């Protein structure tokens, strides 16, 4: 065995475009080093020299978050399928690697090619959270790219000293790009599946022609769905923006694309990720019309995926990846009418693979026995529903379309199907909310406990979020004070003390106030964002960073002279709708907003009318299943709702526990060398288990709630240690030939893991740990 020791750091500045000396940067002294390895299962070699345009899609979060983001992986896969285009990935490194990069004057690098990010033509950032721009600035700084678009010069992209084009996409960038506009050369609005390849073609032609950066951006500005902030400036009122040159659209329409589930099979990371499963999108868009919900407004029309395409993607993806779990994704999964049929068909086809289906938060009014039967598997977990409000009046105001009877029926159905833990999401601070509505949350919990008592013990986990108004929603004109949030939280805490079996979790109000201030801001916030980042803001969605984040943001806001504006918003400065006459409300809602130039397809007048309906607690039906609400989306530009009729539900095969017979035990000697030494023991075991699934070997599983392969490793190697003679046992449900198993399993393992020997041992014999006598170690010592 050999302990890997990193050589002393180089004293010379590295070549800005050369492949990074990865082994000198990442070693066992770095926390969770395997997340930086790249070359995951599913990565294919790319020809750097042959590519006409080179992308790096960056997710401004740590690897475990970014690598499991479905949109990130889909766009990466699509770009790599386009001839002449190459796409790599990058993520925000943790603090220890960030410091090492700075110490060694090394630019942040992409995980596959391991080339510095300035070597790419285009760097794309996913912006899905109002405070996420601080992470983007941290990555730009680590990449040695100027923070502001205006500082990146006018050299052609083909020039070796030209910085990459920097762009943002994602829901936050689409809804209101103005607070972040100064940092980006362009913004990709809406769905990127078709838009990004088009951008790549324009960039490739501009590179070949030697166009300046300015001319290239002018060419990009005429691509539908591309917003170039430098070509737009404030209008006469200084709130909205308008084109600075002729020929540019006054309003920029977002792009809409059809979901492509076969691109979701993606990659299998070496480490455990936040969403450690195969995920396939079944429906894009939501037409429920919840008045607080920005994703529902930004993704219309609703588009169902063909059931057979979903089934094929899951079946093929589970075989390719070896995952034990899969998830079907949509803003409202239960509105995908084919869900029960697709779920049963998948359960039947994958019945012998010991897999579990998971769904995100669902509509409780559509949760029935058909959906309950397809959930879970050998590892049934809890369920999540989102009533949002505690009274019928307030649910009507927000257009939730949910009654107490729906809630009771859904929870009882869940309990009748074996679920005992249910998570419920509520919000406080919604427009029109009173103390009675807040206390109604506790009353709703009490009602559910009482109405379900005959079915056994019910455990409720309640998450209370603070409502923050979002652009392009009917509630974009509203605001609630921080003081009111705190008072209402305390009101609910007191009421919740009397409830047994109910646990309340509250969102920090400081975070909500900052999200609101930035999310509805304008271009004047760019220096505030930079100042907050320099003061220590970053990883702002993480609870551990909250105190530091709050101090950094409030300090930056005060230093910019915007504290008065921040406090006015915090005190409810926009929450005047209830007090206005109809004429006054019309005038109030017609005032310009910083995001008016972004055309989501929904008419601003319709949003104002829907706000009026909210004040009257009037409900608007779901236009996917009832009449058109005339929001303005459907038409030749954005298309129409695509709702697929539900197929017949197949007969479901009985659930069966994974096979646990112990017929044959094979002992393996293996080596773990090279980069695999950076893999922790738990990650190694997970890698072996997934490889076994891909090899489709007749393995034996343990019993109990969480069945696992009967795989035993003799020793857990310390992180960073290579092993040249490790041992493990694996048991099978039938007699197998050791050499054939070795060959079949080896085909599914990555370089650095080599099965060297295999032979049968008695099933009832001693375990490996009992038979170990000694281990031989060798150390390579290097002087600094």
For the regions a language model picked out, list residue spans one by one:
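A short beta-strand-loop structural module common to alpha/beta enzyme folds
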Residues: 84-96, 703
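Structured-RNA-binding interfaces characteristic of tRNA pseudouridine synthases
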Residues: 699, 705-784
């Amino acid at each position: 065995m050999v302990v890997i020791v990193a050589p002393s750091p180089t004293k010379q500045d590295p070549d800005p475009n050369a492949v990074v000396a990865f082994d000198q940067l990442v070693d066992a002294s770095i926390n969770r080093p395997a997340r930086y390895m790249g070359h995951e299962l599913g990565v294919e070699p790319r020809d750097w020299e042959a590519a006409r345009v080179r992308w790096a899609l960056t997710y401004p979060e740590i690897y475990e978050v970014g690598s499991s983001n479905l949109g990130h992986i889909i766009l990466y896969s699509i770009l790599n399928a386009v001839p002449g285009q190459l796409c790599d990935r990058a993520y925000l490194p943790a603090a220890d690697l960030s410091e090492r990069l700075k110490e060694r004057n090394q630019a942040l690098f992409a995980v596959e090619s391991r080339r510095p990010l300035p070597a790419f033509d285009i760097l794309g950032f996913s912006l899905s959270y109002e405070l996420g721009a601080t992470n983007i600035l941290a990555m730009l700084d680590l990449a040695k790219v100027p923070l502001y678009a205006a500082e990146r010069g006018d050299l052609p992209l083909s020039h070796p000293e030209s910085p990459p084009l920097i762009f943002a996409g994602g829901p936050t960038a689409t809804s209101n790009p103005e607070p972040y506009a100064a940092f980006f050369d362009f913004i990709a609005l809406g769905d990127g599946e078709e838009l990004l390849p088009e951008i790549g073609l324009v960039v490739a032609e501009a590179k070949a022609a030697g166009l300046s950066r300015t001319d290239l951006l002018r060419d990009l500005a005429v691509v539908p769905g591309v917003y170039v902030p430098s070509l737009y400036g404030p209008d006469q009122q200084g709130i909205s923006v308008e084109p600075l040159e002729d020929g540019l659209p006054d309003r920029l329409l977002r792009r809409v694309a059809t979901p492509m589930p076969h691109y979701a099979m993606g990659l299998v990371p070496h480490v455990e990720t936040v969403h450690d499963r195969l995920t396939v999108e079944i429906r894009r868009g939501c037409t429920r019309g919840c008045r607080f919900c920005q994703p529902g407004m930004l993704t219309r029309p609703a588009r169902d995926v063909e059931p057979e395409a979903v089934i094929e993607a899951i079946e093929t993806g589970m075989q390719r990846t070896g995952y034990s779990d899969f998830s079907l994704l949509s803003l409202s999964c239960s509105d995908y009418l084919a869900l029960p049929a697709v779920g049963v068909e998948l359960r039947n086809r994958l019945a012998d693979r010991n897999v579990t289906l998971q769904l995100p938060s669902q509509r409780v009014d559509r949760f029935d026995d058909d959906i309950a039967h397809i959930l879970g598997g050998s590892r049934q977990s809890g369920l999540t529903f989102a009533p949002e409000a505690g009274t019928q009046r307030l649910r009507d105001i927000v257009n939730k379309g949910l009654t107490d009877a729906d809630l009771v029926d859904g929870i009882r159905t869940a309990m009748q199907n074996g679920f005992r833990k249910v998570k419920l999401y509520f919000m406080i601070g919604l427009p029109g909310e009173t103390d009675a509505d807040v206390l109604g949350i506790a009353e709703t919990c009490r009602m559910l406990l009482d109405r379900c008592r005959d079915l056994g013990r019910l455990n409720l986990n309640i998450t209370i979020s603070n409502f923050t108004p979002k652009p392009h929603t009917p509630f974009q004109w509203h605001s609630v004070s921080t003081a009111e949030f705190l008072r209402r939280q305390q009101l609910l805490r007191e009421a919740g003390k009397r409830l047994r079996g109910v646990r309340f979790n509250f969102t920090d109000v400081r975070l909500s106030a900052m999200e609101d201030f930035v999310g509805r801001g304008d271009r004047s916030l760019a220096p505030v964002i930079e100042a907050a980042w320099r003061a220590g803001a970053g990883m702002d969605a993480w609870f551990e960073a909250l105190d530091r984040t709050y101090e950094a943001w409030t300090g930056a806001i005060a230093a910019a002279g915007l504290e008065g504006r921040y406090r006015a918003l915090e005190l409810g400065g926009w929450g005047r709708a209830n007090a206005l006459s109809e004429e006054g409300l019309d005038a109030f809602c017609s005032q310009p907003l910083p995001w008016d130039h972004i055309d989501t397809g929904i008419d601003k007048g319709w949003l104002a009318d829907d706000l009026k309906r909210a004040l009257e607690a009037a409900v608007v039906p779901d236009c996917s299943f009832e009449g058109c609400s005339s929001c303005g989306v459907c038409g030749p530009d954005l298309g129409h709702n695509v709702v697929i009729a539900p197929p017949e539900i197949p007969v479901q095969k009985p659930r069966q526990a994974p096979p646990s017979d112990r017929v044959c035990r094979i002992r393996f000697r293996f080596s773990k060398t090279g980069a695999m030494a950076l893999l922790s023991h738990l990650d190694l075991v997970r890698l072996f288990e997934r490889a076994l699934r891909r090899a489709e070997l007749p393995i034996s599983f343990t019993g109990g709630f969480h069945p696992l392969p009967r795989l035993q490793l003799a020793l857990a190697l310390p992180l960073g240690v290579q092993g040249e003679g490790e041992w493990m046992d694996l048991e099978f449900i039938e007699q197998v030939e050791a050499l054939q198993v070795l060959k079949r399993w080896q085909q599914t393992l990555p370089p650095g893991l080599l099965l060297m020997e295999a032979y049968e041992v008695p099933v009832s014999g001693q375990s490996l740990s009992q038979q170990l006598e000694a281990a031989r170690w060798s150390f390579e010592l290097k002087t600094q």
